[in-house]
C-alpha cells in the first residue's frame, strides 16, 4: 500500500471534528434566529500539538464558509488579532418572492418610447 503525504496529516481528523462541531452550533443558532442575519465568533487560535495551527485554522474556516455558501447563505469573515467573526446573511423566501414579482412588473412597464402610443388610449377615455 502506498503512503501519500496527505495521509500523514495528524490534524485531519481533529480538523473535521472541529468543522462538524462548529457547523452544528451555527445551524442551531440559524434555526433560532428571527432576523435574516447572524454574527458568530469562530474559535481561535487553535492549539494543536503538531502541525501548523494557521494552516488548520485556514482549513477549518474555509470548510465552514464553503458549507454555508453551498447551502445558500452569504458569508463574510472579519479577522482581527485572535478573533474571527462570521457574518452570515440570507434572503427570506418572502423577500425572494417580492423581488421576483417586482422584476416581473418592471418587465411590463411601458418604456419612454412606447408611452406616446399607449397614452393615446388613456387620453381618449
Curated annotation (Swiss-Prot):
- Name of this protein: Uncharacterized protein B125R
Stated induction or repression of this protein's expression: Expressed in the late phase of the viral replicative cycle.
What are the UniProt keywords, alphabetically?
Late protein
The family line of this record is: Belongs to the asfivirus B125R family.
Write down the species: African swine fever virus (strain Badajoz 1971 Vero-adapted)
Amino acid at each position: 500500500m502506498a503512503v501519500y503525504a496527505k495521509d500523514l496529516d495528524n490534524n485531519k481528523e481533529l480538523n473535521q471534528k472541529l468543522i462538524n462541531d462548529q457547523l452544528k452550533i451555527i445551524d442551531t443558532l440559524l434555526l433560532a434566529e428571527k432576523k435574516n442575519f447572524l454574527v458568530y465568533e469562530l474559535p481561535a487560535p487553535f492549539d494543536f500539538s503538531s502541525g501548523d495551527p494557521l494552516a488548520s485554522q485556514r482549513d477549518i474556516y474555509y470548510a465552514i464558509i464553503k458549507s454555508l455558501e453551498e447551502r445558500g447563505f452569504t458569508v463574510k469573515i472579519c479577522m482581527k488579532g485572535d478573533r474571527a467573526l462570521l457574518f452570515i446573511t440570507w434572503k427570506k423566501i418572502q423577500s425572494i418572492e417580492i423581488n421576483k414579482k417586482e422584476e416581473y412588473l418592471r418587465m411590463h412597464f411601458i418604456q419612454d418610447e412606447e408611452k406616446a402610443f399607449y397614452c393615446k388610449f388613456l387620453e381618449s377615455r
